[in-house]
Amino acid sequence: MAKHQAPDRHPVRDRAAIRTTALAMIGLTLFVIAMIASYSGAFAKPTLHHMSVAVAAPQQVVDGIRGQDALAVTEVGDDAAARAQVYERKTDAAFVVAPTGEMKIYVAGGGGRSVANAAEIVGRTVAAKAGLAATVEDVAPAAAGDPSGTVEFYAIIFISIGASVGATVVGRLMGAVRNPLTLALRTATLAGFSAVLAGAVTVYVDVILGALTGHTWQVFGALWLYAMAVGGAITGVAAAFGSFASMVLTAFLVVIGNAAAAGPVGRPLLSGFYSTFTAIVPQGSGVSLLRSVEYFGGNGAQTPLVTLAIWGAAGCLLAIVATASRVNYRAIYERFLPGSAGRDGAILRPGLLSPAD
């Protein structure tokens, strides 16, 4: 035997490793391209598609505004009612024609500077056609540290990444959810991590950026709920359908969900495709909830709260069903088919449920 013998090589194994690496690199490249295409399609050329406005004006002016396809008009009786519509998040803007021949334009910078700017342009155009002088009032201005009103969007999308990755890492470290105790530990760990994540983001946005106008604990609560909703959904899907399904959900949330959140441009400026998902994906609800508690006194928070609760509850339900199924199958096979368990106690599991999450 030679003193320095070359180690045995396994060509088949080497080819498989090369193929797996190549496929992973191609998949990652396609994922990056999909993100670029999604974000550029949503944000590169914002165009007004649908804006709701409250109007208190003579009928001729109301009819003229109603004739614009991109505007949905709600008629109100007076200035106070119009202003309230905007602050209560029932409309994106409001136009009021005073007896003095002046048009007052109510906008909400806290709901997104792009939307407020678009509303101002529309209002000034209407006023010019009617021969009216126009003034603008911001009923919910953004914080001085966030004049563009986009910090909420960035906080949400990066918490999405943290919650998704955190749920995956916790799953790998703690193992599959095979019994109620493991499920309880996973849930408690996820809740604790979500609190740390929400707390860190809240402190950074408030103390370092100075982008909060107050309501610190409400913002923390909204971020914690959002992180729990995303992390819980990822965990539940992984427990019930396997790691591949959770990866697909994560990719959907990153590629479509982040763009549908409409942070930099606002929902009225999104195309129909993305605006369809805004109220469905957790990102859209997270951004809306943050803005509601920070700038609008909690107005408009009910719908995003319900949406996030549904995402979290769905993930919890999937995890519970998956755990119960595994426990029941284990009991059945150990009772009626004792020979099916090997020396390591491995048992048959239903094909739908993955042992890994």
Listing of model-derived features with the role each one plays in the protein:
Residues 1-15:
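Short, Lys/Arg-rich, polar N-terminal cytosolic tail immediately upstream
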Residues 13-48, 157-167, 253-258:
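Hydrophobic alpha-helical transmembrane segments of multi-pass membrane transport/permease proteins
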Residues 33, 191-199, 312-322:
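Hydrophobic core of alpha-helical transmembrane segments in multi-pass integral membrane proteins
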Residues 50-68, 341-342:
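Short extracytoplasmic/periplasmic juxtamembrane "stem" segments immediately C-terminal to an N-terminal membrane anchor
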Residues 59, 65-141:
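Extracytoplasmic loops/domains of multi-pass membrane proteins
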Residues 92, 129-169:
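Membrane-helix interface and discontinuous TM-entry motifs in multi-pass inner-membrane proteins
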Residues 153-262:
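Transmembrane alpha-helical segments that form the functional core of multipass membrane systems
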Residues 217-357:
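Membrane-spanning alpha-helical segments of multipass transporters and channels
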